[in-house]
Design a protein with these regions (language model features):
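Intrinsically disordered, low-complexity extracellular "stalk/linker" tracts enriched in Gly/Pro/Ser/Thr
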Residues: 1-8
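Peptidoglycan cell-wall recognition and remodeling modules
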Residues: 8-129
Length: 129
């Protein structure tokens, strides 16, 4: 999903605030900007039209097929269960730029260590993180 954030100023602020709140190095900033452009185009309200079964990875379009199916949502296109697992206390709104950025940073730390390690980020063939 591509779009433009309704409050463009809030997105860079969210990145710098999330970096401070999570304690990661400022070197994360450019990568987080690159990642949000690839994932949502900077639109905190973005929702991928494809439903994904969180357990099997199976995909479907149209309406929600049933329990356990989610859409990638928000700036960093997180699935709801992943967002909940990595959200910070008090930052539980998947559509809030700061909350989504914090959860994304926490997920990236856990899975990749640093966003520089996300395969093909910023290159042709990038397929999501």
């Amino acid at each position: 999903a591509k779009g433009v954030a309704k409050d463009v100023g809030s997105v860079p602020d969210a990145i710098s605030q999330a970096i401070q709140l999570t304690g990661v190095d400022t070197s994360w900033g450019p990568y987080m900007k690159l990642l949000l452009q690839a994932e949502s185009g900077g639109n905190p309200m973005a929702r991928n039209p494809i439903w994904v079964n969180y357990r099997t990875g199976q995909q479907a379009s149209g309406g929600r097929p049933g329990p356990g199916w989610y859409q990638a949502t928000g700036l960093y296109q997180m699935m709801e269960p992943t967002f909940r697992s990595y959200a910070a206390p008090g930052h539980d709104d998947i559509y809030n730029p700061l909350d989504n950025t914090i959860a994304s940073i926490n997920y990236i730390k856990s899975r990749y260590g640093h966003p520089a390690n996300i395969p093909r980020l910023g290159q042709p063939g990038y397929r999501g993180y």
